[in-house]
Amino acid sequence: MTQETQQLTLALSKGRIFEETLPLLEAAGIKVTEDPETSRKLILQTNDANVRVIIVRASDVPTYVQYGAADFGVAGKDVLLEHGGEGLYQPIDLNIANCRMSVAVKDGFDYESAVQQGARLRVVTKYVQTAREHFAAKGVHVDLIKLYGSMELGPLVGLADAIVDLVSTGSTLRANHLVEVERIMDISSRLVVNKAALKLKRERLQPILEAFEKASKRSS
């Protein structure tokens, strides 16, 4: 086998997931030698010549892993629900990047009354599939509008009655005069593995997966 076929590729997104994955990698004896926040490189080397990290958009991590461009990756439950999880093995909830997915509205909007009266609500979200399933299960009539950022703006400019988005501290909602009215689910990030890689590269992958699992349990 060539060096390239022996090499393991880990897909990560910049920001919180990357930062919170670093201690898990270090528990497996792997250190990333470059910082994606200061480097323009999208392929980062590690102290292990057989492990590299690729930096992709958070929503693209499952796709890279599904099609084998990455052997494994770390993605939020929110992203995996939208992706569908096809072709992925999800062995470990890493208990990192914890937050929640919630419904929020402009302060002063009576969400409960609108729902009880059967009003049709306009909702902006990046998580269309998850939002659709949530509102359908509750019997709430909604028109969903997909946005890719700045969800909080929707209710402020009359684009929507509500948003479905991730909430951590709630400070962004408060700064934009929005209030959380419904908690849909808790979100954390999970390890995802390409099913073919798990078979073909099990000997190299297994120790890393076990180290991740032990480290995530210690931090939970």
Curated annotation (Swiss-Prot):
It is an enzyme of class 2 (transferase). It is found in: Cytoplasm. This is ATP phosphoribosyltransferase. It catalyses: 1-(5-phospho-beta-D-ribosyl)-ATP + diphosphate = 5-phospho-alpha-D-ribose 1-diphosphate + ATP. It comes from Janthinobacterium sp. (strain Marseille) (Minibacterium massiliensis). PANTHER family: ATP PHOSPHORIBOSYLTRANSFERASE, ATP PHOSPHORIBOSYLTRANSFERASE ATP-PRTASE. GO terms for molecular function: ATP binding; ATP phosphoribosyltransferase activity. Catalyzes the condensation of ATP and 5-phosphoribose 1-diphosphate to form N'-(5'-phosphoribosyl)-ATP (PR-ATP). Has a crucial role in the pathway because the rate of histidine biosynthesis seems to be controlled primarily by regulation of HisG enzymatic activity. Pathway: Amino-acid biosynthesis; L-histidine biosynthesis; L-histidine from 5-phospho-alpha-D-ribose 1-diphosphate: step 1/9. One of its GO terms (cellular component) is cytoplasm. Its EC number is 2.4.2.17. NCBIfam families: hisG. It holds the Pfam family HisG. Lacks the C-terminal regulatory region which is replaced by HisZ. Disulfide bonds: none annotated. Its main location: cytoplasm. Signal peptide: none annotated. Belongs to the ATP phosphoribosyltransferase family. Short subfamily. Heteromultimer composed of HisG and HisZ subunits. InterPro entries: ATP_PRibTrfase_cat (IPR013820), ATP_PRibTrfase_CS (IPR018198), ATP_PRibTrfase_HisG (IPR001348), ATP_PRibTrfase_HisG_short (IPR024893). GO terms for biological process: L-histidine biosynthetic process.
